[in-house]
């Protein structure tokens, strides 16, 4: 297998990513860092660790562009894409490999957890990931349709990846775009929870806002791009519909209904609606945390999750209004860390 590491000004983190790849129980044939015209010496850091470094003639403008540039060099049957701020559990690559014993499988992804859990935003994301990957992703895998093969770490069958033209930059969520395109092409995607990766998550509100803006617009753009094709894919259409509807209703409830009712009816207790589903969230979260012996960390991080969830709702509602109502699509790719 060949690993592609797209990197733009990632000198502070790319070494950890490379070392985690070099320490894998299943060593990759080649590690290729795509230095996307960085200005901080990212390429030099990578070269010092003995990996292949390629640099496009000009900045590609997106992670999708950098990954597709790296794909040109791949000569192996499998291709791994990993962010330059992400480290892997020592057996992550080995854990993903069995998924490709089935010829219909085109992609496989693993369990994602934040590398650092310190700030309120990192803590909120920690609970968000524990909940999503312990509950939603497992359910999607049961029906054979994981909603997305995570962009921070996924493995692909190279021939099929090339058939898709690599990663497209037509949306802000190239990983979601590729996953849904694979389904519509009759291919399968697998979720392997034993393959764990640890990306660096936004530590400040400014960084989180940048990431949420990109993610929210990316989801809406993909719904608009793929909605006809989604209708032909059983289970995926339901998963997307539920996710879109849930996010829309949640945005309306958190940002309008609850505060309005609390003020108009003079009933402050109505604001408890923000955490009314706490038991449903806590069960899978604590189950996932228990398996990792992180119960105390999880309990301490739960309040941050409800803060982040409300902020998520705000950015999703803004994206829906911008993309569907105002016709202001997001085209500039900005990193979120």
Question: In which residue ranges do the predicted regions lie?
Answer:
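N-proximal low-complexity "stem/linker" segments adjacent to membrane-targeting elements
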Residues: 1-19
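Cell-envelope/extracellular polymer assembly enzymes that use nucleotide-activated donors
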Residues: 1-2, 30, 177
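Acidic helix N-cap motif at the loop->helix transition within catalytic regions
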Residues: 15-16, 40-47, 91
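Short, acidic, metal-binding catalytic loop of nucleotide-sugar glycosyltransferases
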Residues: 19-28
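Short beta-strand/loop segment that forms part of the nucleotide-sugar
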Residues: 29-37, 54-56
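Long helical/loop segments within the catalytic core of UDP-sugar-dependent glycosyltransferases
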Residues: 55, 59-72, 76-77, 90-169, ...
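The conserved acidic donor/metal-binding loop of glycosyltransferases
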Residues: 83-87, 170
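Membrane-embedded multi-pass helical conduit in multi-pass membrane proteins
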Residues: 246-326
């Amino acid at each position: 297998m060949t690993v592609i590491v797209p990197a733009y000004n990632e000198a502070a983190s790319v070494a950890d990513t490379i070392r985690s790849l070099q320490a894998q129980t299943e060593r990759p044939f080649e590690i290729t860092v795509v230095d996307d015209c960085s200005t901080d010496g990212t390429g030099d850091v990578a070269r010092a660790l003995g990996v292949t470094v390629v640099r496009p003639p000009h900045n590609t403008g997106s992670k999708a562009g950098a990954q597709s540039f790296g794909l040109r060099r791949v000569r192996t049957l499998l291709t791994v894409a990993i962010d330059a701020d992400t480290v892997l559990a020592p057996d992550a690559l080995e854990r993903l490999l069995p998924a490709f014993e089935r010829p219909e499988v085109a992609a496989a992804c693993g369990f994602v957890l934040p590398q650092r859990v310190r700030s309120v935003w990192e803590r909120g994301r920690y609970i968000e990931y524990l909940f999503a990957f312990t509950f939603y992703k497992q359910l999607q895998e049961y029906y054979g349709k994981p909603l997305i093969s995570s962009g921070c770490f996924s493995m692909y069958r190279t021939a099929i990846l090339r058939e898709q033209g690599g990663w497209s930059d037509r949306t802000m969520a190239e990983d979601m775009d590729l996953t849904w395109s694979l389904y519509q092409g009759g291919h399968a995607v697998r979720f392997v929870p034993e393959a764990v990766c640890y990306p660096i998550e936004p530590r400040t509100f400014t960084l989180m806002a940048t990431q949420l803006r990109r993610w929210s617009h990316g989801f809406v753009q993909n719904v608009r791009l793929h909605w006809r094709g989604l209708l032909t894919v059983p289970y995926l259409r339901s998963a997307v519909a539920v996710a879109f509807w849930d996010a829309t209703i949640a945005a309306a409830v958190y940002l309008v209904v609850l505060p309005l009712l609390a003020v108009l009816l003079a009933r402050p207790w109505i604001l408890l609606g923000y955490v009314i589903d706490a038991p449903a969230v806590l069960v899978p979260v604590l189950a996932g945390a228990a398996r990792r012996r992180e119960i105390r960390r999880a309990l301490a991080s739960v309040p941050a999750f409800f803060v982040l969830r409300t902020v998520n709702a705000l950015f999703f509602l803004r994206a829906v209004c911008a993309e569907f109502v105002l016709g202001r699509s997001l085209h500039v790719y900005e990193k979120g860390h």
